[in-house]
Swiss-Prot record:
This is Formate--tetrahydrofolate ligase. Keywords: ATP-binding, Ligase, Nucleotide-binding, One-carbon metabolism. It comes from Limosilactobacillus fermentum (strain NBRC 3956 / LMG 18251) (Lactobacillus fermentum). It is an enzyme of class 6 (ligase). InterPro entries: Formate_THF_ligase (IPR000559), Formate_THF_ligase_CS (IPR020628), P-loop_NTPase (IPR027417). Gene3D superfamilies: Domain 2, N(10)-formyltetrahydrofolate synthetase, Formyltetrahydrofolate synthetase, domain 3, P-loop containing nucleotide triphosphate hydrolases. It comes from the Bacteria. One of its GO terms (biological process) is tetrahydrofolate interconversion. Transmembrane segments: none annotated. The gene is fhs.
Amino acid sequence: MLTDIEIADQAQLTPINEIAAQLGLDEDAIEQYGKYKAKINLPVQATPEKKHKLVLVTSINPTPAGEGKSTVLVGLGDALSLLHHQTVIAMREPSMGPVFGMKGGATGGGYSQVVPMEDINLHFTGDFHALTSANNTLAALIDNYLMRGNELGLDPRRVIWKRVEDVNDRALRDVVTGLGGIMQGVPRQTGFDITPASELMAILCLATDLSDLKARVSRIVVGYTYDKEPVTVGQLGFEEAVTILLKDAIKPNLVQTLGHTPAIVHGGPFANIAHGCNSVLATKTALQLADYTVTEAGFGADLGAEKFLDIKRPVLGKTPDAVVIVATVRALEYNGGASLQALKDENLTELENGLQNLNRHIANMQRYGLPLVVAINHFATDTPAEIKLIEDNCKARGVNVVVADAWAKGGAGTLDLAKEVVALAEQEASFTPLYDYQATPKEKVETIATKVYGAGRVAFSKKALNQLKQFEKLGWNDLPICIAKTQYSFTDDQTQLGAPEGFTFHIREFVPKLGAGFIVALAGNMLTMPGLPKVPAAVKMTIDSEGKITGLF
């Protein structure tokens, strides 16, 4: 059996200018990064005769290895193309932290990949490096401001802007800077986040154009004065420099699938510690050019899909016409109590228990009023009895189920899912927001925790409650909420699998992100700088004297 990278290496790619031509984009509309990658110059002209349908792919709570949501996404896009629908896949860029850590890349798998997979999973077009440079330039400017006058009285103890790196590096979570004497700056305690957690990543993914990006950058709160008043980038006059560093990164990236379907891969916030959606500009561009735009939101529907619908959708101005919930037999069994070592065996009892996890995700999407289908991402170890149990469960809830064999067969293995999605997208949907945006941040957190997660109550730390009082005084109550929590559980405890009910959900702290336009609520012990596992993916990779890489997935 070939590995993902071996399959990708054997693929015959179409020159990117020909992929662009499929969308009506001529060579002046793109900036090529080699033969198979390009940036799309903005704005693009909409194609009025297209259907402009939006399909959101989400999933149940995953196992640590992930459940192939990106694989199903790509397979679905290729299947829609095989059915002669102009289709564009809109997805996030991978972070090199997980690529070299535990989860691996994010370009799909098997015969459902976006390519060139090696480039996309590594440095791609440099967007993450530009974001890292912009973020850290702002951090350096802040430290310089503290040292050279500090006219606004920014309190070094209350600077909340952190540096970032696109690596999993737990040693950088808490650091002290400015040591070494008076010429080395003002000593202060700070830390590093991973680049996808940066507010600049969220801003890049929510900005509607370069002017909006600059306006959002200017609204970033970097810290507070000695009088506890917020200080923004705009007050410091640093927004121009930061925006200059992002002027190319804001342009969406165009690549292709193994089936030669156009794919716009742009932006990469994580869904557990950020809002987990690709850029608004990428999705809008795809919608303007295609009959069907197939996009994804990170991790389970409790994280990525909720944030897509409550944070991204209002900016995008478009509600999904259909939702696909990806489930796997192994993840359902894992959520039902099976050990990771037993997931290759038939575990009908654990599978039945784990179906409660899927059922809650179904109910959550139905609460929004969206047409949906469940896609079973097929693994070779799945048995007919396991598949039937899932099908019977979903049919009892009025939801159709389709088995997708995207990894092994690409678009051809996902045709049934594509036909179901086309039928769903023609239905009339009546979207219902989860919460009132005029509600307080506390009320919004409680709504998400009780209605989406199944919590009985929310416990706020003393620090969080004090922050809520401050936010009310500052007029920040109308911002949406972005909860940072574990992806493995509906709770804030990653060991509580399945579909727990009536539990206490814990919020320890809030982080205002006015540039992005939301407030982050940190739940449990969620960290914004991941660490590496005992055996990182990095140690399984090799490169030979000719530059050929193995072990990348």
